[in-house]
Amino acid sequence: MRNADPSLRLDDPARQLTLAQTLRDLRKRGVRCIAAHPHTDKKILSQADFTGDCCIVFGNEGDGISEEVLEACDEAVAIPMPPTVDSLNVGAAAAVFLYEVARQRKKI
């Protein structure tokens, strides 16, 4: 895996067997791992800090994010939605998260 910052390069990408293992490796290197999770009540998107190095994990539209991956993340963050809306599709959720990242980093 290549990254603009060589210190974030994974030792051996072929050795990274699961997403959870990769997330734990990233956390050891100082990258905050954030799960985009529609059913968390701990933190909403505007309360999360995206100003530093971070990795945002999105689940698939059918099963979401596995418990193992959730546990490997630093925190879970939700997009606030009305009670009648269960979740957004992954493309829409990613767009909302990336807008917030850009806003916090003053790119927009």
Annotate each PLM feature.
Residues 1-108:
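Post-transcriptional modification and biogenesis factors for structured RNAs
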